Swiss-Prot record:
It comes from Salmonella schwarzengrund (strain CVM19633). The keyword Cytoplasm does not apply. Signal peptide: none annotated. It catalyses: L-methionyl-[protein] + [thioredoxin]-disulfide + H2O = L-methionyl-(S)-S-oxide-[protein] + [thioredoxin]-dithiol; [thioredoxin]-disulfide + L-methionine + H2O = L-methionine (S)-S-oxide + [thioredoxin]-dithiol. Its EC number is 1.8.4.11. It comes from the Bacteria. One of its GO terms (biological process) is cellular response to oxidative stress. This is Peptide methionine sulfoxide reductase MsrA. Keywords: Oxidoreductase. One of its GO terms (cellular component) is cytoplasm. The active site is at residue 52. The keyword Oxidoreductase applies.
Length: 212
């Protein structure tokens, strides 16, 4: 596909067929050795897409209260896609991060603050120099409460941008979580395994106002 084509989401009818076999990954998180698949009692899950998932995953695994993180693909159609397929723009997925967190230590609203303040949510089908539908900004809520918090935070951040003189519209999609597919093991905790690797995330200098 051309770069122009990759700026437009593929339709479900035109998406690649994928496969039934899940991607094999390591059982344990390379940084904290917690399970990357199990969710301990009392923990919750959040899904965010902010561009290249290498830097995004590191951003969240460093937070107190985050039990584990995983790089993967969300918001698309193709079952169990490969990285190459996602980068083709023919699966509909965004590069996303799965975050398992303890809400008694860090709230979903605090994760949303990290989300908004650490990337540019106005760039459509790109993030910085990374172009393609897989780099779009997205929040994939799992519950009505997460959805309400996500939409409210988007309104507050848009207002904060306007107050700072930035009138570009936010392009972040907020849609109910579709299946999350783990990325290949080489992408898991990539910047821990490759400390000098590429990290393309960065904020726009606007802070998310607290919920009134």
């Amino acid at each position: 596909m051309s770069l122009f084509d990759k700026k437009h989401l593929v339709t479900q009818a035109d998406a690649l067929p994928g496969r039934n076999t899940p991607m094999p990954i390591a059982t344990l998180h390379a940084v904290n050795e917690h399970s990357m698949t199990n969710v301990p009692a009392g923990m919750e899950i959040a899904y965010f897409a902010m561009g290249c998932f290498w830097g995004v995953e590191r951003l969240f695994w460093q937070l107190p209260g985050v039990y584990s993180t995983a790089a993967g693909y969300a918001g698309g159609y193709t079952p169990n896609p490969t990285y190459r397929e996602v980068c083709s723009g023919q699966t509909g997925h965004a590069e996303a991060v799965r975050i398992v967190y303890d809400p008694a230590v860090i709230r979903y609203e605090q994760l949303l603050q990290i989300f908004w303040e650490n990337h540019d949510p106005t760039q459509g089908m790109q993030q910085g120099n990374d172009h393609g539908t897989q780099y779009r900004s997205a929040i994939y809520p799992l519950t009505p409460e997460q959805s309400a918090a996500a939409h409210a935070s988007r309104e507050r951040f848009q207002s904060a941008m306007a107050a700072a003189g930035n009138h570009r519209p936010i392009t972040t999609e907020i849609t109910h979580a579709t299946p999350f597919y783990y990325a290949e093991d080489e992408h898991q905790q990539y910047l821990h395994k490759n400390p000098y690797g590429y990290c393309g995330i960065g904020g726009i200098g606007v802070c998310l106002p607290p919920d009134a």
